[in-house]
Amino acid sequence: MLKYNQLRVGRYNILGKIRYNSQPPQRQQPLYNRLSNALLVVYDQNGNRLGVLENADDPILEQEIGSVDTLTFSLPYNDPKREYIQNENIVEVVNQRYFIRDVSKVRAGGRLELVVYCEATWYDLQYTEPMKALSWQDATPEQIMADILDGTGWTVGRVEVTERRNLQLEEGLTNRLKALRELPNVFTGELWFNTSNNTVDFLRPEGRDSGASIVYRKNMKEIEVNYSTKNLVTKLYLYGKNNMTIEDAHPEGLPYIENYQYTTKKKVMVVKDERFTNPFHLYERGVYALSILSRPTASYVMKVADLSRMSGLSHEQFALGDNVFVYDKELGIN
């Protein structure tokens, strides 16, 4: 989860009623290209630029890869651009676009303001026409995504994952966003939605090496680190559709896999996933999952000053999904 606010503070850790517009709005070039200095820009429903919200206060982006992307901000009630804050108008942050969903009039401490909640334009994928295809055999993510997005105004972008899987969606499923979110559960990849050009990427979960460093007394204001073995597993029994096992795929013909990379303790979990009909696909996915489950999880929550807007420090810029270097000598974090 990544949160930004106007003070350039980030928050990290490891881990309504919506109207669907079948015709995507026209595009104009973004006014800003860096998040650290960007102001909010508002457009009408047809994509015509209305103005820059210079007086928008406390803008907060809350983002999590492939699942959460919302924007909240407030605006003084007497702001002359208040008239642009209409439900279903579009707010742009650099090259990311959001539909205005909720507008509240608030009186707090003698101050009148509008409090605005927005959702990324890709949220509307959950309110589209029913899908034509619900089943795929030995298909790549690109093939499945193309079928899911067909007729939505969105298209497949960059796909780095080339493995093949079988996938059967439940009959009557009309939520294409929910269908897309099945892919990370079956393949090893991450969904990235590009609201600037209405494309969806499916990338390997490796992250970009940003080159940025977060260091105490430099740009780190607060940090909280947690290490946990609450959900640690070292032995995994896997079952697919109709209680299919992985015995045909396992090199030793076993119905389970093991990984003792962190501890020799035997901690067993049984998993059944009806989406898998091929034992080799289930085995491959299980090996990957256990490589993660068999080691402690770590989460880092930090408040960080964004230095990238300062002269000579543009290399300190980072974004959601990037790899960053974290150092705190006193806490032994490196």
Q: Predicted segment positions?
A:
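Glycine-centered loop/turn motifs
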Residues: Y84-I90, G172-L173, R217-N219, G321
